[in-house]
């Protein structure tokens, strides 16, 4: 399965910053990302390794269904979101702020 680099740069949409993701990052060395809905686990692993230069131990994904919300009298629905919990290999560290700063310089 050949994964082209352009696709890999588009797989990860954004890091998820929340109370839960911060606890996972500190205690389990897991990073949380919002990813494309059709992204596969091997793709996510390759994308994180390519973009951040770290070794990935495992990837767990979950698709969160969008909530139904009202806008006046009309019903609308938020988009479904796919999250990836990426476990880094022992001894690996990922600093998102440093990675973002490096990406801005390029």
From Swiss-Prot:
GO terms for cellular component: ribonucleoprotein complex; ribosome. Coiled coil: none annotated. SUPFAM superfamilies: Ribosomal proteins S24e, L23 and L15e. The keyword Metal-binding does not apply. One of its GO terms (biological process) is translation. It comes from the Bacteria. Part of the 50S ribosomal subunit. Contacts protein L29, and trigger factor when it is bound to the ribosome. One of the early assembly proteins it binds 23S rRNA. One of the proteins that surrounds the polypeptide exit tunnel on the outside of the ribosome. Forms the main docking site for trigger factor binding to the ribosome. NCBIfam families: PRK05738.1-3, PRK05738.2-4. This is Large ribosomal subunit protein uL23. It comes from Neisseria meningitidis serogroup C / serotype 2a (strain ATCC 700532 / DSM 15464 / FAM18). The gene is rplW.
